[in-house]
């Protein structure tokens, strides 16, 4: 049935092209492909319209677009005009039509391709003239259906109009500019038809006279066919076919099921029946045995699976190397820079931030200080979708050497400069820009990253520079480069005395930094209560107009931010202090755990709704009681290679009454160079990795005798390190020659399990990242400013069975070994003391002499005295040598 035509304003008459006469054997074309086999499109010329009184906009209009035509009139037109008649294509249809009148409909919108169409069945004519009435429910249902329904219109051939594209094609096409010369070569006419004479010829006398086909082994007979076990089942093939039927008359209907139940009489009869009692008595023993088995062990465990996992983890050596996935280089930087710090975005997958600094020594930096002021110091945000253009560029007053995302809100970033200032950024206004990056996609679709050749970089994208919103005070902050920065956990806060209090705000509000000026500073980003109220006139004088593109989140800190407290590491009796380079707090391991990423995402969504950093209030530490059982000790790595375990709490000097730092709890000089990595294990809170100089050490908090593991000197100096995020016994160490040493404590504890070359220059930073359960990456930065993204293989990312317990058992053995060594050291010292006392006793030991021995000794002493006296007198000339007699006689 043809649907009713829509009521629209008339567009006027259309000029129709002349149609060639159809051949006698041409089949009429109907609209069966569109679901209307009874409709046959026609082209009626103006002459035909006048003959049959169906002129457009006169006889047939929008209100009455159809006309009933007598069958005999059509036959008369066919006899008069023959093949020229417009009804000639449907002549066969008209002859087979059972009725006397055919329905001709004006197709104003060319729905079926021509200006008229003929309905060739009585049923179709009745449905068009008398459409079935639609119920009211169906009318209401149709009101909600959009009227703009797509109507298929077959393409109509049109004459080609030149718009100049053929000239471009002719210019790009290659044509021959010179005329070709044709040569025809043939034999002499006299040689045609000459007799042919064949003779023998030596094949070796003429070069290339023959082609030799030497024998060779056919590889088809040497290939080994592998056998494969394939299970087959003889069953008939099943094909799933589904159809979708339109619900013409929808109605609300509900269905409810309920179980069939026994009546009270049947229940009582069944309870007292003997078959039920016998069944319960027989089945109770089997059920009890099954329950006991479930309590004792898991009967459904797959033993073969666990055996295969151990073998596959340590036996599969085909995929053990890091594979380079992508690399990023700042091609727009005019100067040569190195990467100083790397950090993956906590919530947006595929986004990584790096800080860059100029590769200059201290003397060169002072010499070129004027030129360096003209170049921006940046933190670059790279995305996997565009390896050439950074997504964001954070500007800072000077080169950044360390930065961290805020755990409560990833849009807040804190960084430390080379001049000792702390810089704060707020990228909340640009969060939508970096969240809609192609590589990251939606957060629900992150199974695998797309390869590089499927990503389309935005070549015309302009760089987005973001200015910092606050910097610390130059006079009251650090005096030298800031080497490390950390956010304190959102569960606690400290005051100027170092006492720990509960953090009621629920967000991270404090920072800790260490610098080469021998200080460790704690900072609070909340506004501090002024001691004296300021007048409104003074506030107006101090107010500074900020640019419109700089958020006012930390406006109260800009150029007036002072540290909450300072900690100095004294060297004891001397006036010198230790120079810290890296620190590790007790709460740092919480930020490294992989399961905290979902928590970070929920915190991000909450921060977007409430914006807690836009309405910061001063701390409540003065109103709360301090937490006494909180561990305030932390590890510090120094520039001289020392590892110090100290306390951040301050104490008063009994003589001066000033606040001073406590003495370090323990102090060890293990490394022969600057400590640049000190990090807690993400699996063990009390295990710390330190890297510095030419060796690596692993410590346990609470063990003051020394490190659990200390490596021997490496062939090249170590420059960076990081724990694995999924394997407790694996950590990565970067070297100055571009190699990465991969340590696996389950395989080797005295040397790296493997070493792999990554670049040709020094590796400056290492940062792993978990993308999914099947894919992990490790970001490696080098001295030339290139960021290498490496894919971690399966053997280094998937932990083996009971690996955590095995590594923990290894650490416990090392602790016992240290205790044994300490005991042996004390015993040996005691033995040495006893041996020294024994030797001293032997030296001063006196013997008891007899009376005869004492008289003999006195006599010998007296005789030696007389001999000496005689010699002196002879020398003085008092007696002569020739004189005989004893000296006693002379006397």
Swiss-Prot record:
SUPFAM superfamilies: WD40 repeat-like (SSF50978). Interacts with ACTR2; this interaction reduces binding of the Arp2/3 complex to the VCA domain of nucleation promoting factors. Part of the multisubunit axonemal dynein complex formed at least of two heavy chains and a number of intermediate and light chains. Found in a associated with the catalytic heavy chain DNAH2, the intermediate chain DNAI4, and the light chain DYNLT1. Its main location: cytoplasm. It comes from Homo sapiens. Residues 1-22 are annotated as: Disordered. Residues 1-17 have a biased composition (Basic residues). Induction: Up-regulated at the transcriptional level by TP53. It is found in: Cytoplasm. Residues 818-861 form a coiled coil. Acts as a negative regulator of cell migration, invasion, and metastasis downstream of p53/TP53, through inhibition of Arp2/3 complex-mediated actin polymerization. Via its association with the multisubunit axonemal dynein complex, is potentially involved in the regulation of cilia function. May play a role in osteogenesis of dental tissue-derived mesenchymal stem cells. Signal peptide: none annotated. GO terms for biological process: cilium movement involved in cell motility; inner dynein arm assembly; negative regulation of Arp2/3 complex-mediated actin nucleation; negative regulation of cell migration; positive regulation of osteoblast differentiation. PROSITE patterns: WD_REPEATS_1 (PS00678). One of its GO terms (cellular component) is cytoplasm. It is linked to A rare heterozygous in-frame DNAI3 deletion encompassing exons 14-17 has been found in a fetus with encephalocele. Overexpression of human DNAI3 RNA lacking exons 14-17 in zebrafish embryos also results in similar brain malformations, suggesting that DNAI3 defects might be involved in encephalocele formation. WD repeats lie at residues 395-435, 477-533, 670-709, 713-753. This is Dynein axonemal intermediate chain 3. The gene is DNAI3.
């Amino acid at each position: 049935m043809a649907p009713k035509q829509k009521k629209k304003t008339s567009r006027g008459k259309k000029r129709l092209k002349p149609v060639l006469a159809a051949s006698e054997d041409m089949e009429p074309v109907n609209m069966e492909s569109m679901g209307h086999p009874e409709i046959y499109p026609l082209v009626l010329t103006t002459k035909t319209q006048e003959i049959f009184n169906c002129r457009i906009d006169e006889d047939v209009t929008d209100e009455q677009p159809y006309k009933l035509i007598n069958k005999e009139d059509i036959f008369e037109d066919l006899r008069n005009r023959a093949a020229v008649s417009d009804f000639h294509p449907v002549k066969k249809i008209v002859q087979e039509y059972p009725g006397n009148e055919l329905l001709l409909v004006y197709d104003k919108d060319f729905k079926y391709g021509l200006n008229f169409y003929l309905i060739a069945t009585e049923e179709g004519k009745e449905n068009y003239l008398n459409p079935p009435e639609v119920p009211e429910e169906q009318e209401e249902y149709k009101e909600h259906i959009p009227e703009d329904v797509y109507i298929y219109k077959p393409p109509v051939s049109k004459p080609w109009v030149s718009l100049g594209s053929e000239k471009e094609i002719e210019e790009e096409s290659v044509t021959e500019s010179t005329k070709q010369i044709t040569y025809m070569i043939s034999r002499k006419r006299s040689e045609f038809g000459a007799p042919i004479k064949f003779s023998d010829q030596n094949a070796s006398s003429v070069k290339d006279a023959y082609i030799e086909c030497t024998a060779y082994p056919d590889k088809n007979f040497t290939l080994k066919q592998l056998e494969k076990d394939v299970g087959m089942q003889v069953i008939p093939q099943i094909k799933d076919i589904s159809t979708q039927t339109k619900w013409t008359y929808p109605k609300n209907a509900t269905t409810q099921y309920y179980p069939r139940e026994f009546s009270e009489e049947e229940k009582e009869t069944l309870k007292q029946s003997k078959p039920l009692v016998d069944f319960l008595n027989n089945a109770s023993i089997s059920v009890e045995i099954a329950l006991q088995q479930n309590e004792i062990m898991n009967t459904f465990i797959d033993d073969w699976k666990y055996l295969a996992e151990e073998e596959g983890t340590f036996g599969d050596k085909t995929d053990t190397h890091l594979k380079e996935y992508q690399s990023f280089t700042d091609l727009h930087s005019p100067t040569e820079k190195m990467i100083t710090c790397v950090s993956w975005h906590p919530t947006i997958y595929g986004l990584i931030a790096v800080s860059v600094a100029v590769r200059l020594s201290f003397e060169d930096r002072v010499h070129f200080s004027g030129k360096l002021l003209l170049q921006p110091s940046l933190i670059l945000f790279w995305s996997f979708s565009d390896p050439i253009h950074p997504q964001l560029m954070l500007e800072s007053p000077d080169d950044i050497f360390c930065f961290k995302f805020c755990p409560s809100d990833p849009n807040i970033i804190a960084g430390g400069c080379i001049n000792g200032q702390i810089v704060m950024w707020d990228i909340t206004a640009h969060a939508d820009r970096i969240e809609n990056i192609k590589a990251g996609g939606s957060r629900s679709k992150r199974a695998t990253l797309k390869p590089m050749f499927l990503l389309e970089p935005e070549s015309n994208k302009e760089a987005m520079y973001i200015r910092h919103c606050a910097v610390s005070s130059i006079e009251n902050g650090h005096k030298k480069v800031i080497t490390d920065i950390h956010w304190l956990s959102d569960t606690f806060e400290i005051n100027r005395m170092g006492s720990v209090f509960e953090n009621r705000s629920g967000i991270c509000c404090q920072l800790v930094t260490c610098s080469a000026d021998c200080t460790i500073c704690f900072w609070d980003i909340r506004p501090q209560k002024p001691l004296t109220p300021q007048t409104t006139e003074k506030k107006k004088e101090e107010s500074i107009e900020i640019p419109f593109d700089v958020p006012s989140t930390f406006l109260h800190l800009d150029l007036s931010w002072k540290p909450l407290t300072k900690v100095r590491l004294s060297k004891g009796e001397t006036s010198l202090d230790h120079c810290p380079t890296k620190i590790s707090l007790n709460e740092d391991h919480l930020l490294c755990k992989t399961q905290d990423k979902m928590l970070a995402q929920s915190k991000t969504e909450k921060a977007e709704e409430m914006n807690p950093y836009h309405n910061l209030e001063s701390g409540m530490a003065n109103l709360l009681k301090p937490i006494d059982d909180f561990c305030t000790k932390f590890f510090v790595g120094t520039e001289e290679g020392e590892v110090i375990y100290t306390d951040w709490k301050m104490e008063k000097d009994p003589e001066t009454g000033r606040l001073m730092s406590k003495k370090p709890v323990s102090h060890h000089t293990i490394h022969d160079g600057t400590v640049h990595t000190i990090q807690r294990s993400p699996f063990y809170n009390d295990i710390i990795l330190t890297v510095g100089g030419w060796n690596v050490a692993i410590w346990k908090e609470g063990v003051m005798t020394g490190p659990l593991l200390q490596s021997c000197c490496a062939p090249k100096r170590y420059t960076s390190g990081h724990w694995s995020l999924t394997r407790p016994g694996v950590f990565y160490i970067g070297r100055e020659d571009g190699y990465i040493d991969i340590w696996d404590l389950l395989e080797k504890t005295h040397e790296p399990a493997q070493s792999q070359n990554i670049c040709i220059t020094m590796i400056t930073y290492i940062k792993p990242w978990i993308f999914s359960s099947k894919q992990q990456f490790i970001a490696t930065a080098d001295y030339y400013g290139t960021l290498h993204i490496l894919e971690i293989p399966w053997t280094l990312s998937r932990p083996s069975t009971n690996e955590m317990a095995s590594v923990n058992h290894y650490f416990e053995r090392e602790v016992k070994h240290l205790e044994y060594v300490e005991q042996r050291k004390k015993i040996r010292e005691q033995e040495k003391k006893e041996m020294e006392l024994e030797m001293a006793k032997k030296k001063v030991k006196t013997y008891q002499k007899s009376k005869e021995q004492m008289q003999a000794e006195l006599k010998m002493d007296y005789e030696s005295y007389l001999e000496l006296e005689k010699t002196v007198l002879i020398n003085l000339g008092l007696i002569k040598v020739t004189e005989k007699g004893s000296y006693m006689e002379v006397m």
